[in-house]
Structures are given as structure tokens and as C-alpha cells.
């Protein structure tokens, strides 16, 4: 009989092992056997919890997108009366949270984006994440700008966030957070009306 609470512990172990494997060998070269070995479990455990490698990869990406959502929401909840500028900076901060810019997370996101073009479930996850970012940004810009300008500013800031993140991911170096925050802050202040 399985121990109570083991499922969440095992799932966490396997997701962490998947991130480690992707970080070291890439998504395509990460095998079920390697992941199981890293997690200290049998390959049958992966099949039991996730069906197959694709199920495990999907769960890993759901976990990373959930961490992104939480990083943004935690910052926004801390600013219930914050200005549009403060709340936009909170969204930026959530996207540059350590859970999103660690080497393992960045490599997993890159692999996820590439795979999402060919796997419908990953594509849906990618679309939800992308739409959530844009919706959050537009909503905050909308507090100060007409709809069309808010949509353009939101799209521009989303592109800047993604671009800064992508440049860091492809450089193999850590994200320069002070520079990223400076550039995004400048973009935000350029697009919000001055008092």
C-alpha cells in the first residue's frame, strides 16, 4: 500500500530531476532512465505518475508556468493600491524571478518553446502563459492609457521582457537583472503619462 503524501513528493522529485537532466543534456537527450536515476526511483515510477516522457515534460512545464504565475501574483498582491508603474514593475520582477532565470529553468523554457511548435499540449501551455503575460501588462497600462495605446504598450513590454530573457538564455550567462529592470523601467515610464 502506498504511503500517504508520497505522490506529491515523488512528483516533485521527478520534476526536479527532469529539470536537472534538461539543464545538463537537453530535453531530447534526457532519457527516462537518466531522470529516474537522478530521482533515485525506478523507471516504472515515472510511468505510474506521468505515463511517459511527454507526460513528465508536460508536468515539468506546468510546474514552471505555475511558478511564474505565483511569482507575478505574489508581487501584485503585495501592491493592492500600487500605481500602474509599480504593478508593471512587479510583473517584470515576476518574469525575472530566480525560478524563471536559473540555468535549468531557462533551458527548460527554450526546449519547451521549441517543442510547443510540434506538440499540441505544450502549444496550449505556451499560449496560456503568453496570453497571461500580455493580459496582465495591458490591464495595468489600461489604468493610465486608452485601450489601443495600452495594447501596444503591453505588447511592446512583453516583447522586451521576452527579448531580454531570450538574450540571457542564449548567452549562457545569468540575466543581468539590474540592466533588465532599468530597460523595462525606462520603457514603462516612456509609455505612461507624466503627472
Curated annotation (Swiss-Prot):
Gene3D superfamilies attached to this UniProt entry: Tetracycline Repressor, domain 2
DNA-binding region: 31-50
InterPro entries: BetI_C (IPR039538), DNA-bd_HTH_TetR-type_CS (IPR023772), Homeodomain-like_sf (IPR009057), HTH-type_TetR-like_transc_reg (IPR050109), HTH_TetR (IPR001647), Tet_transcr_reg_TetR-rel_C_sf (IPR036271), Tscrpt_rep_BetI (IPR017757)
Start and end residues of each HTH tetR-type domain: 8-68
Pathway info: Amine and polyamine biosynthesis; betaine biosynthesis via choline pathway [regulation]
PROSITE patterns: HTH_TETR_1 (PS01081), HTH_TETR_2 (PS50977)
Record function comment: Repressor involved in the biosynthesis of the osmoprotectant glycine betaine. It represses transcription of the choline transporter BetT and the genes of BetAB involved in the synthesis of glycine betaine.
Protein name: HTH-type transcriptional regulator BetI
Organism of provenance: Escherichia coli (strain SE11)
Amino acid at each position: 500500500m502506498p504511503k500517504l503524501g508520497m505522490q506529491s513528493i515523488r512528483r516533485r522529485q521527478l520534476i526536479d530531476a527532469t529539470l536537472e537532466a534538461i539543464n545538463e543534456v537537453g530535453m531530447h537527450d534526457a532519457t527516462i532512465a537518466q531522470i529516474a536515476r537522478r530521482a533515485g526511483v525506478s523507471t516504472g515510477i515515472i510511468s505510474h505518475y506521468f505515463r511517459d516522457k511527454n507526460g513528465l515534460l508536460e508536468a515539468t512545464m506546468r510546474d514552471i508556468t505555475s511558478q511564474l504565475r505565483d511569482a507575478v501574483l505574489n508581487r501584485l498582491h503585495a501592491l493592492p493600491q500600487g500605481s500602474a508603474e509599480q504593478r508593471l514593475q512587479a510583473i517584470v520582477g515576476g518574469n525575472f524571478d530566480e525560478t524563471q532565470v536559473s540555468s535549468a529553468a531557462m533551458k527548460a523554457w527554450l526546449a519547451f518553446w521549441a517543442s510547443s511548435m510540434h506538440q499540441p499540449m505544450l502549444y496550449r501551455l505556451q499560449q496560456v502563459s503568453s496570453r497571461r503575460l500580455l493580459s496582465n501588462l495591458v490591464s495595468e497600462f489600461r489604468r493610465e492609457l486608452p485601450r489601443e495605446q495600452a495594447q501596444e504598450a503591453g505588447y511592446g513590454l512583453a516583447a522586451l521582457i521576452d527579448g531580454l530573457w531570450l538574450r540571457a538564455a542564449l548567452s549562457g550567462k545569468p540575466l543581468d537583472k539590474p540592466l533588465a529592470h532599468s530597460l523595462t523601467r525606462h520603457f514603462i515610464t516612456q509609455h505612461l503619462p507624466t503627472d
